[in-house]
Amino acid sequence: MLLLNHLQKKDQSLLSAMNNDAPFQFLPGFTQLYHEYMEENIFIAYSEKLMAFMPLRFFSSRFFKLAQILHAPIKNNIELNPQEQLDFFNELISYLNQNNSCERLVQPHPYGILASVPANSRFCEFGTYIIDLQTQTKEEIFQKFHPKYQKAIHHSEKNGAVVKFGQDVLNDFYLCYTDTMKRISMPSEELQFFKSYYNYLGSDNVTAGVVYDNDNPIGGIFMIHSNYAALCTHAGSRGE
């Protein structure tokens, strides 16, 4: 097992396979974002036995050195099967223990779903929505929406709603997002958080989208993506 870092020249040869066909958590810009903006370190764990990679976030709490798995391990940009994932985790845990790298592995983000769980872990089952965009047309995807949402979309189109994408609509997305977080009494990220994703990953990997009604922003999403997948990480709407 090796811990590699995009910011270390000695590791760049092994990490050269981490291109835009990989999940965005494996990309150099993501490592740089966490290092410079979050002031945390991202390492790519590499199993020489399995020839597979997995991103890890290292950080500290008041009492513990922690590591967070950010995505399931992959080989040739394909997730390992459940048994291979378990083998990877066991090898990783042994390495982290031997090197005193961290004292606890914490749960991944909701978009970091794993197929296996290391022995003696505390865990819960979790599901998320995954839509295959390669094998379906836009019309086929739309027909799978709940009829209520199909009707709402048709109504918006009929009344002149406009959807815009790109960094230019980031401020309007933020209005929608913070309105929602206030309504549910939850803390929100700062605007600079979203700007930093654009700064480090660029428009090839980050997209904000906003729907407008009479030029007023009424809903927005924030997507982080690569050729591997697009993930909606934040969203919100204005009004009731």
Please state what every model-predicted region is:
Residues 2-63, 108-131, 136-240:
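A conserved beta-strand-loop-helix scaffold within acyl/acetyltransferase catalytic domains
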Residues 8, 23, 78, 82-85:
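Intrinsic-disorder-associated interaction segments
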Residues 64-80:
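Glycine-/proline-rich flexible loop or hinge segments
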Residues 72-76, 85, 97:
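Acidic, aromatic-enriched beta-alpha/helix-loop junctions
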Residues 82-94, 240:
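Conserved acetyl-CoA-binding loop-helix of GNAT-fold acetyltransferases
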Residues 90-97, 154, 199:
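Surface-exposed alpha-helical segments enriched in charged/polar residues
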Residues 98-109:
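Conserved GNAT acetyl-CoA-binding A-motif
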